[in-house]
Amino acid sequence: MTERAPIEVRGLRVGDSHRRRVNIGDRPLRVCLLSYRTNPHCGGQGVYIKNLSQALKGLGHHVEVVSGPPGLELDAGIPVIKPPCLDLYNPQDLFRVPSLRELANPINLVEWLSVCTMGFPEPFTFGLRALLVLRRKFGKYDVVHDNQCLSYGLLGIKRFVPTVATIHHPITIDRDTALREAGTLRRRAQIMRWYSFIGMQKRVSRRLDRIITVSKKAQEDITREFGISEDRLVVAPNGVDTDLFRPIPGIERDKTRIMVTNSSDIPLKGLSYLLRAIKKVSCKREVKLVVIGAPKHNGRVQRLVQELGIQEFVTFTGRVTSDELVTHYARSLMAVVPSLYEGFGLPAVEAMACGVAVVSTTGGALPEVVGDAGVLVPAGDSAALALALSQLLSYPERAMELGRRGYKRVLRHFTWEQAAIKTVQAYQEAIRAYR
């Protein structure tokens, strides 16, 4: 058989001789985590990377993180590499105009042009930057773990080191939900342009060594939407930081207070259905809805609150710290997760960890996560949601019991140590399968 000639990739000679055979045994693994967006206080990506990296380190593994904006500050012993980038989605300088010197960089130029034409290039460009950063460091790692970037750059990384990725849920679901809510052809075109990176993610994910996902429901949906066979998918449910999210003794629950941690205009999050449910409940009884965050100015949520005439019943907190969020949980009778779909449902688990009753929809993996520790209603059904809220407001002792049950469920099933152990199993499978 004729030996295959090596391939030149940005100065790297890539061939079979570069594929290291790793004998992992029981020794600690050397792991590199990648995430294109990493706010550790809000947004699932930063929370996932922060907690998983620390849990892996706690198991004795060696971890480095390549982080997109705004970046992470992790515990000592977990180095964080921050590739230079344009950071065009920085809320302090949103969609700034880069300098000519910055645009002389081809990756920066592609990113800027895509943003100017209403695309979302961050996953693509971050993957290329990660490849450039890591190209002289591949020998340091046993495995590279991407967090739903799924960029073509990963295929370059995969030539040198076993590579896995976490897909929290298929983004096609977000796109299709947004399209159903779109009112005009122009808006539909904008949505399709924004989600144009999905084709890349499908192609890349099919070529990686293993895919990690966070629930059985997400596993089924990824198989259907991305065409990945189930035997290449490993389910490793997310955890929750139980040192932070915990019951707080001594704080009395307000038996009229309901909270939700999402203020987004994104249709998938289902906040509009909760607002309509609050309208129904407020006609018959005293109720307060506390929404963590702030609505987009003149956005869907803000307009709907005004249209329904429920301003006196709804309070938006603005940005809160993690400790303030836990205090909000402690003061509330119940927390609501009104999402039309969740690949996992971190807000539900955080609420359960704080000992607060959860009212959740059946969207996506939420029934799998909440189990019998909460009240489940059909997704997108404001009448059913209003009935569930009214019942717990009428019987607060039932809400207290659900809160205790949820807390026990979290400790049994949803710690970050458990998540890290299952993630390491996926790493080991990927390393053994690497050819």
What name fits each language-model region?
Residues 93-118, 158-202:
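Acceptor-binding helix/loop patch of EC 2.4 sugar-transfer enzymes
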Residues 217, 239:
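Carbohydrate-associated surface elements
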Residues 251-278, 290:
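Conserved donor-binding/catalytic core segment of Leloir-type glycosyltransferases
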Residues 300-323:
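Nucleotide-activated donor-binding/catalytic signature segment of Leloir-type glycosyltransferases, i.e.
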Residues 319-320, 327-332:
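Short alpha-helical donor nucleotide-sugar binding micro-motif in glycosyltransferases
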Residues 340:
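Aromatic "clamp/platform" in nucleotide-sugar-dependent glycosyltransferases that forms part
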Residues 357-360:
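Short hydrophobic beta-strand element within catalytic cores of glycosyltransferases
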Residues 375-382, 391-396:
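Conserved acidic donor-binding segment of nucleotide-sugar-dependent glycosyltransferases
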